[in-house]
Amino acid sequence: MSEYGFEDCELCDSPGGEVVWESALCRVVMVADADYPGFCRVIMHRHLGEMTDLPQRERMQVMNVVFAVESAVRSLYRPDKINLASLGNMTPH
């Protein structure tokens, strides 16, 4: 078993970027991508098919993390627009 969960899962085998915050539910990582300054991911620690598979309380916790990350990125980078995306189409997380 890897640090974050299952073997043979790219999101479990490595943190996925520089971990800037972590809880029992998820972690926030900064992704080093010169084309996308401020690119962050909120990554669940357990495998889920969809966000709606989370219990309501955890859904709200995850969304509060997403909103906090958005606020931090807006404050630090002052982008013209924030792009929020759910990209779990390759790896259930």
Model-predicted regions and their roles:
Residues 1-93:
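HIT superfamily nucleotide-processing domains
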